[in-house]
């Protein structure tokens, strides 16, 4: 970022903010400078007075327009720096010394003000529902969404979240008017029970904002009455660090959209199930699915048992073992179940099974009781054989598996496993 020096048109110590009372103001540029970042140029303007709120206290800055007789220039952001309110524009006015009319975007300001007031109401509701240990740890207020970080030791329950929503919406319906004291002393604020941020440094005079029983020290913009918020809805609650939780919420039309979306989803589910009683239909579907799953599992086990009987019957014992060494396209679950089924039927079993799943080779070795009694270890066998398919594995003395990267080496791994076992069987 390349920032030029300020061009001063007339001296100014700090910006006069008039945005609590008006969204339109006659202004003059006191100083300006050019900023270049990533090849893009913007300009920062400081007015003698301004209705634009500068990004601070968790609330994003206003956007809007500055107008003169000859031009209209969008204000794309407003920041605050060293007591100055800085307006970001993408072009410098033709005549910086002219008088301008500064106009805040009223819809964006109202939406942000509604969300800021809703944040205060939620803060109070959280303390009522969770306890007085709740303290603000951070916040973000935009026209679209509000975010509030607070101290709490565990995840909030659905019932607690519902209680917070109900308390906030009760305050919204009560339509509490904004009561503010811009010249309150810290002592007066303490007597009123105003919420103060821990570690925050306050001046001799503070701005105290009240909506019903919610009282906080705050420099942000607020709605004129809680009824303007319309409706409050929590989107989610999560942990951001040890002992700190975060709630994201929306108000007004955005909150309504959340409800409409949920209703649409329920309607789609109801139509899909052909049943207006969604919960009962879903329960019935799960019960039916569970019963079908049990039937399928029973059939699968029977199939595995039949397959095992067929393999045993067609595999004669040779040199003291029943050797089964093949490749299969069966799933790993089927291969494992088959291996255990074969072991239960053949005490002299040597099963070396290879398969490829999702392009990756897998080797399975199962040994009968009489084979492991001779000291043959399936885990040691697969570890050595798997090297031929660029893999590794292990397991128990009687059962082990290995995975690899090279399916072209699977047959060689099978042959190696048979060779290693054959060398140890007496």
Regions from the PLM with identified roles:
Residues 1-426:
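A glycine- and charged-residue-rich anion-binding loop/surface
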